Amino acid sequence: MGMWASVDAMWDFPAEKRIFGAVLLFSWTVYLWETFLAQRQRRIYKTTTRVPAELEQIMDSDTFEKSRLYQLDKSTFSFWSGLYSEVEGTFILLFGGIPYLWRLSGQFCSSAGFGPEYEIIQSLVFLLLATLFSALTGLPWSLYNTFVIEEKHGFNHQTLEFFMKDAIKKFIVTQCILLPVSALLLYIIKIGGDYFFIYAWLFTLVVSLVLVTIYADYIAPLFDKFTPLPEGKLKQEIEVMAKSIDFPLTKVYVVEGSKRSSHSNAYFYGFFKNKRIVLFDTLLEEYSVPNKDNQEESGMEARNEGEGDSEEVKAKVKNKKQGCKNEEVLAVLGHELGHWKLGHTVKNIIISQMNSFLCFFLFAVLIGRRELFAAFGFYDSQPTLIGLLIIFQFIFSPYNEVLSFCLTVLSRRFEFQADAFAKKLGKAKDLYSALIKLNKDNLGFPVSDWLFSTWHYSHPPLLERLQALKNAKQD
């Protein structure tokens, strides 16, 4: 009777109290679940000190131990940063941080001559202050991750000056995009009438497509140097492979990722008949950063930021041989182009937009509920931006967790399909060796807890991918 009496008493609380309590309870439930999973994986890092028999042919004990220690350090960092983030978020909610920041934004606006009727301007000030707070509180964690953990394990290639310039530039670019887009979205919601959710969804769709279109050409070059892949065998073979599957390739770039880190990557971008491929220089074993003269001849300007530490960066990269041979790079690209050929990119866009439409529709249903605002300290006003924050971040959090897990499962399926596509191109053997090299270069730990990997891994564990490719090689 005592337990049921407590449950009945809980329902006697006002609706806003129940909403607030449910949000906090769910947040901590997710945090404890994530911590439980992380501790399961951490136990694997601690106890698996020898190379498993099935890995002896592909990984030496030295690399295995390095990856184990690297992942242990990352696990420790993740625990403390996650705990801080959860406690900080709880304190912000308990002590009315959101309404306080909204009032502070209003005071700034009042001092500039803008009254309460200028809600959109107040919303932009709120966003600026909120993102500034987030950047400042996250800075120590980012510094520790970069200059302690990544540095310790040989991945960091940045100086402190380069890091800070980069952080400031990212913040400025983010504000230049976030503030005008947010202002237009809020305006559309306010004037859109009963069907504002349709107009808001269409607006965000257009914005996302524009950002995807301009990112690699206008935004990414603000932070990294992109150089056309030199004429040669690799470029020729990439073009031949692209043509064989009707991929409308227009350009191939190499990005100087080694200026920041030893981690490697490759991707493609662009719409319709204007596709481009980007390779990280850390992915290419047979590639060196062009000197200044070569850059000028190719028409590409070198970055000004961090030029003083270029030699230091190059020295670090040369001291650590990494990357893939041309045949392996082609296999990796065969996998990436498989995502395009199999329609994975389009499917992800469709899923994203269906989710976006559903969220805006539900937002339209819930935005008039005063108890949602009251739950977070807004008793006398219902600002649109605050409504977006409350509903999208807090009320939708259970749905977001379920959706995230489903997308993770789908992503793993897509990865297997892309590997199979590379196999059909005759790249199984080279992709097999490339995956081993990339895992070694990035110090990925090849042993994982099944529950942790099921919940978190957007890519299948290395052993599962290798087994599938091994069967393909035998075929």
From Swiss-Prot:
UniProt remark on cofactor binding: Binds 1 zinc ion per subunit.
E.C. numbers: 3.4.24.84
InterPro entries: CAXX_Prtase_1, Peptidase_M48, Peptidase_M48_N
Gene3D superfamilies, sorted: Metalloproteases ('zincins'), catalytic domain (3.30.2010.10)
Cofactor: Zn(2+)
Nuclear-side positions: 40-81, 145-170, 217-347, 406-475
Keyword Zinc listed: yes
Activation/inhibition comment: Inhibited by HIV protease inhibitors, such as lopinavir, tipranavir and nelfinavir, leading to defects in lamin A/LMNA maturation and accumulation of prelamin-A/C precursors in cells. This causes defects in nuclear envelope integrity and release of DNA in the cytosol, activating the AIM2 inflammasome.
CDD domains, sorted: M48A_Zmpste24p_like
Enzyme superclass (EC): hydrolase
Residues holding Zn(2+): H335, H339, E415
Sample GO molecular function, one term: metalloendopeptidase activity
Positions of the UniProt region annotated as Disordered: 293-314
Basic and acidic residues: bias regions: 300-314
Disruption phenotype: Severe growth retardation and premature death. Mice gain weight slowly, appear malnourished and exhibit progressive hair loss. Mice suffer from dilated cardiomyopathy, muscular dystrophy and lipodystrophy due to defects in lamin A/LMNA maturation. Mice also show spontaneous bone fractures and muscle weakness due to defects in lamin A/LMNA maturation. Mutant mice show increased viral protein expression, enhanced viral reporter activity, and higher titers of infectious viral particles.
Keyword line: Antiviral protein, Endoplasmic reticulum, Endosome, Hydrolase, Membrane, Metal-binding, Metalloprotease, Nucleus, Protease, Transmembrane, Transmembrane helix, Zinc
Positions on the Lumenal side per record topology: 1-18, 103-123, 192-195, 369-382
GO biological process, one term: regulation of cell shape
Active site: E336
Transmembrane residue ranges: 19-39, 82-102, 124-144, 171-191, 196-216, 348-368, 383-405
Catalytic activity: Hydrolyzes the peptide bond -P2-(S-farnesyl or geranylgeranyl)C-P1'-P2'-P3'-COOH where P1' and P2' are amino acids with aliphatic side chains and P3' is any C-terminal residue
Cellular component terms per the entry's GO annotation: early endosome membrane; endoplasmic reticulum membrane; late endosome membrane; membrane; nuclear envelope; nuclear inner membrane; protein-containing complex
Family: Belongs to the peptidase M48A family.
Protein name: CAAX prenyl protease 1 homolog
Organism of origin: Mus musculus (Mouse)
Lineage of origin: Eukaryota, Metazoa, Chordata, Craniata, Vertebrata
